[in-house]
């Protein structure tokens, strides 16, 4: 009414329509992560619901807030990016540019770490930076991060013995 949403018209499990009235309505509809070349999201997340809301004059807030993970395993393969968890950096993994020098404090907040990585990638003219997990030791890697270890092996990297390429997604 008057371009204000006072609830939602929905269907229950038996396909019966019901009206749910509310003083405020939050439209949480997924995101746009699938639009990015490198993303941990599924490719079908393209912001369709956001576009529909805009077409109907719905006032949207904070749509520019997109979470970017600083470190995912770089690959040329299409599909979802594989997250190299922030906890790996929290355990002590280090990041390096192509010159072999560290360029940032690895435990910076995600948005700042992502910015630092992107700046280094631009400086190096590379689609990734290097992560050194070897400093954690083989036992820690295999026991604390077994899924990451296995995924790196699938991509041709032994993260217990060599640096791995990582990129924001």
Model-predicted regions and their roles:
Residues 1-4:
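A conserved short coil-to-beta-strand element within the FAD-binding core of flavoproteins
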Residues 10-14, 97-99:
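Short acidic, glycine-rich loop/turn motifs
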Residues 14-24:
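Core beta-strand elements of the Rossmann-like FAD/NAD(P) dinucleotide-binding domain
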Residues 22-24, 28-33:
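Glycine-/small-residue-rich beta->alpha transition segments that form the dinucleotide
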Residues 31-34, 38, 68-71:
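Glycine-rich phosphate/pyrophosphate-binding beta-alpha loops
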Residues 35-56:
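A conserved FAD-binding loop/helix module that cradles the flavin
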Residues 52, 58-168:
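An anion/pyrophosphate-binding glycine-rich loop and adjacent beta-alpha core
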